[in-house]
Each structure stands twice: as C-alpha cells, then as structure tokens.
Amino acid sequence: MNIQILLLLILFSTFASTKSDVSFTVETSLRTTLQEVNADSGLVMLMDSAGNVIGKSSLSLLNGKSLEDEVYTTVRDMGTLAVPVSLIPVLEKGNVSLSDTVDVGNGIYNHNGKEIRDHNADMGGYGEITLQQAILFDSKVGVIKSLSPYTTIKTTYSPTEILNFYHSIAVSDHSICSAKTMKEIQQTFEMVVSEGTGKPLFSDNVKIAGKTGSVIKE
C-alpha cells in the first residue's frame, strides 16, 4: 500500500528565529513522521498568519530525496481534508445544519455504485451521529449522506489551495462566508482536536484547531 503524509500548518507565532531554522525544523519533523508511520512520501507546508509560506518540505523515503517543487501545486485527491470547502456553501444556504443527524450505520455505504468506507467500518461504524460529529470523527459516510443531496463534494485540490482555504478560516476571512458560519466552522475545528480525530495533538498550553483527512487509493 502506498502511504502518503500531507501536513499543512498555519502558525500565529513560531520560535524559530531564521528561515533556515524553520526549514530545518520542517524537514526534520517530516522525516521523523514518515519513518514513524512507515509512509512512502509526504510534504509539509508552514504558513504564517499573514499568508506567507515560511517553510515547506517534501520527501520520498523510497529514494531519500526531496520531491519536485510542483508537488505543492499539483492537483490531487485530498480526501476528507477538502470536505469543509463543500460544506461551507451548503451551510450558508441553510440546506443543512451541523446539528442535523445522519445514520452512518456500520460505516459502509454505496454511493453512485461506489463503496464508501469509514475508517472504523471494521469495528461497526458510528451509527447515528450529527453532521458535526461526522466532521470531528472523519466519517466519509456521514458527510456524503448529509451533503450529496445538495452539492457535489469536490475533493481534488492542490496542497497550496487547501492551505490557503484553511488560512482563510484561521484568520476569519469573511469573504468566504458569513460570521455565523465562520464561527461554527472554527468551533468545529477546535473540537476536532479536543474531542475528535485530532485529539493526539490536544494541548492544555496552546489552543489548536484543525481538520484531519484521509483518502484511500486502490
């Protein structure tokens, strides 16, 4: 199985004093993570609050070399990491609410002839959950059943496009949605870390918000 790691970070402060410090830290962290999870390749992009990419690294453990710069702008399937891009317009129109419930059953669902599986399908799935919980626990079935009646869920973006989207959420850019929707999304991203699939990153010392994502390649 080909395993890839994609990590996009937005920092409002950093202890690294120089660009070289940031680059070294980013590459070292990526290499360590790839080895820990036995992944084939991965990339990291680090953006500051002003929207500047202050560090990035892409590595392949298959040959130990950095990937080409095009990897940051190449469109690919971003999986559930891209779900909020489709979610926001649907929330804005009032088609759905984060408190709406959806039955994901055993975590296996046939959508347009394709089998969709949640990461915990082998353990029986989540059953009935809210749309917000589908985001927190990275339930593909919950998201598709909730949103597909109202929109086409696009998941193909470049890492740079996705990073810019999450930066807009981090800095409360109301050009992409209303203040109400922005607050709901930000609170949900905080809960991903405090209660959901991002819980391993939770810290009592600093507030962290974000979204985990996954994609299965046949």
Spans of model-derived segments:
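A penicillin-recognizing enzyme superfamily signal
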Residues: 133, 141, 145, 149-218
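Beta-strand segments within the central parallel beta-sheet cores of soluble alpha/beta enzyme folds
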Residues: 46, 100-107, 180, 184
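Short pre-catalytic segments that frame enzyme active sites
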Residues: 19-82, 93-95, 114
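Extracytoplasmic
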Residues: 39-41, 71, 77, 81-82, ...
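Sec-dependent N-terminal signal peptides
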Residues: 3-13
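Conserved catalytic neighborhood of penicillin-recognizing serine enzymes
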Residues: 96-150, 171
